[in-house]
Amino acid sequence: MYKIAFDVMGSDNGSAVAIEAASRFIKSRKDLYLVFVGDEDQIKTSLEKFPIDESRFEILATKEFIDMNGSIMDIRRKKDSSMVRALETLKDKKVDAMITGGNSAAFIAGSHFILGELNGISRPGFMPTLPTAVSNKLTLLLDVGANLEADIEDIIGYAKMANIYAKNVLKIENPLIAQLNIGEEKSKGTLLQKEIYKELESDENINFFGNLESRDILAGKVDIIVTDGYTGNMCLKAFEGASKILMTEIKSQLYKTIFTKLKALTLKKSFDNVSKKFDYKNHSGAILLGVEGIAFKAHGSSDVKSFEATLRMTCDAVENDVLNKIKKELN
């Protein structure tokens, strides 16, 4: 039985959405036990509407939560916040993993102060899973914003940790790893990127593809893409925004006139398949790689679908024991 602490406070859409997602998801996982962390009254009210078998959950009541406008200092100030308590349950090994949809900066700071980093890692990285144009193929991208800067050791660490994750969770035998850059040529990029290229190329344990341009992130050419958090975050948000706008525009054009509506009926299945594949909500959530625990960050604006995706990814990480395997690799 896997035990996951779920901080249901602090996200944009409130605790009810998180509870609804949990209620739907837990039906498909008989091996899952949830610890809901947050305002007890709100949680109980939501559970009345979205019931869960009482043997499958417990409530860890807190009096505070860190909202999106909070600061990293709230980790120190709000000792009884849902995020802090969820992180503490993970540190104390009372749960196997934790999830929050709350303030990203506070989550990163809390993970640093409460969980601490793994041996050899100074800057953890957020790693989401992205869809690609290749059927049934996903790509891992990191860092997407845990840290704005990264040095050579950070990027090499990201590559090593993501390599273990891809092998065990995505079941890829020999993951292909690329560095995000402004061109494919070895000579492209900053001095730092050129040095990173040399390090990745010379590492016998890394199956290095070379440089990858941002236009090919979703092409399915590689399994893992490493970059600094500033660049990665911009790429991720560009994908999310473009995906949303493109799907909305296609739908608008298909339902513009009676003629196009009739035509749309013949294309509905194909459109639904593409829409489902590239809807970022189906891949929402990012693991914070490099900390002493399996900690996932759901999107701040998560809806039910997004939270379900994060729950699924968290269960996969726990089930495949990625933390211990990453620690073994780093040591």
From Swiss-Prot:
The keyword Nucleus does not apply. The gene is plsX. It is found in: Cytoplasm. Its EC number is 2.3.1.274. The keyword Lipid biosynthesis applies. Catalyzes the reversible formation of acyl-phosphate (acyl-PO(4)) from acyl-[acyl-carrier-protein] (acyl-ACP). This enzyme utilizes acyl-ACP as fatty acyl donor, but not acyl-CoA. Its main location: cytoplasm. Keywords: Cytoplasm, Lipid biosynthesis, Lipid metabolism, Phospholipid biosynthesis, Phospholipid metabolism, Transferase. This is Phosphate acyltransferase.
